[in-house]
From Swiss-Prot:
Family: In the C-terminal section; belongs to the purine/pyrimidine phosphoribosyltransferase family.
Tissues where this protein is expressed: Mostly expressed at low levels in leaves, and, to a lower extent, in cotyledons.
UniProt name for this protein: Amidophosphoribosyltransferase 3, chloroplastic
Keyword DNA damage appears in the UniProt entry: no
EC number: 2.4.2.14
Amino acid sequence: MAFSVEEISSILPNSLSANPRNVSQNTISPSFFKPSLKPYASKTLISLSCRRSLSPVFSAGTYVTNVDEDDKLHEECGVVGIHGDPEASRLSYLALHALQHRGQEGAGIVAANQNGLESITGVGLVSDVFTESKLNNLPGDIAIGHVRYSTSGASMLKNVQPFIASCKLGSLAVAHNGNFVNYKQLKTKLEEMGSIFITSSDTELVLHLIAKSKAKTFLLRVIDACEKLRGAYSMVFVFEDKLIAVRDPFGFRPLVMGRRSNGAVVFASETCALDLIDATYEREVCPGEIVVVDRNHGDSSMFMISHPEQKQCVFEHGYFSQPNSIVFGRSVYETRRMYGEILATVAPVDCDVVIAVPDSGTVAALGYAAKAGVPFQIGLLRSHYAKRTFIEPTQEIRDFAVKVKLSPVRAVLEGKRVVVVDDSIVRGTTSLKIVRMLRDAGAKEVHMRIALPPMIASCYYGVDTPRSQELISSKMSVEAIQKHINCDSLAFLPLDSLKGVYGPVESHRYCYACFTGKYPVTKTESEEADAS
């Protein structure tokens, strides 16, 4: 079944255009950089044998948010892999739309066919990067895809995945969700051995480790590389006729496996991507597991050195993942609803209406309202057309940022005692503006309820978080934050209550480092100094 971009666009939100922007089109070809004869597609994006950097040949652009996005956490990326479907690239395109919330600054797809590995990558949304003509240049029944959110605020084309590289065994491609805490240490060692890094992405580290490995097969080289990596990684690889999925031994980031009716195997960061392409969810890729899919033997798996305790990111349930996904074996929707119900039990308040900060606070607010026996209403409207921009806004414009993104509904708020539920407070700037906005719209009282515990520490496992000292809860008490944002009361979901949602056994499988400062995998001293 073939899809055109026009057909695909017809089932997607109107806000997602299909206008290309900053897409890699191989307009420059140094002697060591051999492009495909087809337009828009390259066989080698990264050549590990080259002795000089490719960085001068790539364009770069800096995205700056003008809607206060810097006061929210950001998942760094989402991945998809498909094996055994003649429409693998188009299905990857659809799946990446479903994962767009995990990264909005870049997207890419690599397809394997008789010509080798061919890729299209670009800066912007999935619909900005791909058009019908570009997808036509990605034939093949194996493909991997990636959506990216950069940690530094700079989104450069050379950093957009998937990455393609050549080594002694042949060409390979990789897409990665996570973060390696020993990146700088390993990079320094590899550079001392002669490796030249082309990008500033830690994902490139994997390619160099595979290229340097002495193992005789590609799979053994992947295992060899993973044994050297510390931190979070859910990755998909393409090599020859194989699609390989890998998840770190702690299981920090999600990675699920599904199958289409024609037998095609699909890997994705969330089940919502499977749903969109009519793939049936089968299971998670287990922490420490490597799943190999090839044409001759179907799918098989093996395990690397496992860790006795999983440490899955609890923020996947609280904020990052789509409510219609199953993540870590649990419904995201039901888990968030339980957060809200417990929050209403431990932090009740007399009120007339419960509202949410959309979209991530909505399900918890529904749970809070149901448990409190108070009506839930839409008190804040979110504009989904407030996008990131290349224009550096002035401070005066930044002051209007929340108003651009959120609009109060006066008919719901005026004269009411309002409980407003959000998923988290990061720096506190957005919460301050929301409270002011609700009061300006006539709210008699404003009570903030946060569906996760206070954040006091940065995340090193694939989440773009501010430095610890920039987190308001790391330097202020709850009472001080309440006064700072000028609400009538403020309460967070206690950590013990959060763990209670999962029960005494399952709760030990989650990472709470951003709430406790206790990290399951620590950075080296030099890296911690750089991050502080």
